[in-house]
Amino acid sequence: MAKIGFVSLGCPKALVDSEQILSRLKALGYETSPSYEEAELVIVNTCGFINEAVEESLEAIGEALKENGKVVVTGCLGARPEKIRERHPQVLAVTGPGEVERVLEAVQEVLPAPRDPFLDLIPPQVKLTPRHYAYVKLSEGCDHRCSFCIIPKLRGRLRSRDAADVLAEAARLVATGTKELLLVAQDLSAYGVDLGHRESLWGDRPVRAELKDLLTHMAELGVWIRLHYVYPYPHVKDLLPLMAEGKVLPYLDVPLQHASPRILRLMRRPGGYESHLKTLKAWREVVPELALRSTFIVGFPGETEEDFQILLDFLEEAELDRVGVFAYSPVEGAEANRLPDPVPEEVKEERKARLLEVQARVSLRKNQRFVGKTLEVLVDELPEPGLAVGRTYRDAPGVDGVVYVETDGTVRVGERIPVRILRADTYDLHGVQA
């Protein structure tokens, strides 16, 4: 049977693309191989967002060519084929993000499909995450024009899925053991705008392609639902009652990027110190336990020490639960590259370190508030007898903290258990099964 090697790079949205490609390949009869040596061809799903990701992708392509020789490239960097072929002219094919059919065509030109996919009534689905959680992509592309970003050039304009299609996928995942659905998009809160929020039928029920209506129906599946990449639109407040009622996890991943109004204008992003705080305060009034994650860019062109201090002051006052930070890196094709007053690399790194130091204090302070409380924990791992590693509603996999739990030895991966918190670290919690 024909064997395919697969390398998946980039964000959770790219991971969903990888799962779709692998599911289609499996339906065609291909097997996946964990080694270059056994594979007859290798697919590399690339990232092309920042320079470091571009270089990582090019290196991965080079390694696959060296170890195997037959390589098909897809993903965000594939939207710039000249970049790939300049370094690696011997790749078999280059396709852009989300171009599943073109990937399949490129593979079949070299390795004919082992079987007719129509022999299977229900094609198998391949997951690259553990069985108990899964990423579900609501839309592709983005209509924003942030000056530091080229995602609209790589992935195109916003293209949402019908709500019934999303719900059908979610229901299939839950039926096969998924306990947590992580909803992703380039801009989750814009879901359905391009469709005019049209209705589609899920069973015999009409559901609008609008986030609140979608979540209301999805909540009936009875699993954790986590929202990622939520642009801070005013209508986000409409989702909060679902969190207050326990239908959706009280967790929002909101990439604010900065707090200085001047820098945000240069970034073509909304808000600023005061408006950010006002928004967060309003959300917390509805859902006091709301966990907030955000990402920030330091060292953006023109960022002064005063601008940076505004950001530090904001972090102290906002008390976000989780924070990611990037030192600004020019992205080929981004409009921000033309801005004056670039920040020296050493200053970028120094500011990044200072920001992380401030957030570490905030994170520890927030974590300590949970000592003595009992939290529900979703078990991710069982590294040794009597010990489990899991996550609370405050923790997305791979990017947030974890909870180390002393257990009675009977818990299973994917199980939700009550845990009494005994101790807090800067990012993680320690507790005992209650």
Swiss-Prot record:
Q: How is the cofactor bound?
A: Binds 2 [4Fe-4S] clusters. One cluster is coordinated with 3 cysteines and an exchangeable S-adenosyl-L-methionine.
Spell out the SUPFAM superfamilies in the cross-references.
Radical SAM enzymes
Domain MTTase N-terminal as annotated: residue spans: 2-112
Keyword entries, A-Z: 4Fe-4S, Cytoplasm, Iron, Iron-sulfur, Metal-binding, S-adenosyl-L-methionine, Transferase
Q: Which domain of life is it from?
A: Bacteria
| Binding residue positions for [4Fe-4S] cluster 2 | C142, C146, C149
Per UniProt, where does [4Fe-4S] cluster 1 bind?
C11, C47, C76
Q: Listed GO cellular component terms?
A: cytosol
Q: Which InterPro entries match?
A: Elp3/MiaA/NifB-like_rSAM (IPR006638), Methylthiotransferase (IPR005839), Methylthiotransferase_CS (IPR020612), Methylthiotransferase_N (IPR013848), Methylthiotransferase_N_sf (IPR038135), NA-bd_OB-fold (IPR012340), Ribosomal_uS12_MeSTrfase_RimO (IPR005840), rSAM (IPR007197)
What reaction does this catalyse?
Answer: L-aspartate(89)-[ribosomal protein uS12]-hydrogen + (sulfur carrier)-SH + AH2 + 2 S-adenosyl-L-methionine = 3-methylsulfanyl-L-aspartate(89)-[ribosomal protein uS12]-hydrogen + (sulfur carrier)-H + 5'-deoxyadenosine + L-methionine + A + S-adenosyl-L-homocysteine + 2 H(+)
Query: What EC number(s) would the UniProt record show?
Result: 2.8.4.4
Short name of one Pfam family: Radical_SAM
Which subcellular locations apply to this protein? Answer: Cytoplasm
Record-annotated TRAM domain positions:
368-434
What is one process in the GO biological process aspect for this record? tRNA modification
Q: Which cofactor does it need?
A: [4Fe-4S] cluster
Q: Which residues are in the Radical SAM core domain?
A: 128-365
A single GO molecular-function term is: 4 iron, 4 sulfur cluster binding
Kindly report, in one word, the top-level EC class recorded for this enzyme: transferase
Please tell me where this protein is predominantly located. Answer: cytoplasm
Q: What does this protein do?
A: Catalyzes the methylthiolation of an aspartic acid residue of ribosomal protein uS12.
Q: Which family, according to UniProt?
A: Belongs to the methylthiotransferase family. RimO subfamily.
Name of protein: Ribosomal protein uS12 methylthiotransferase RimO
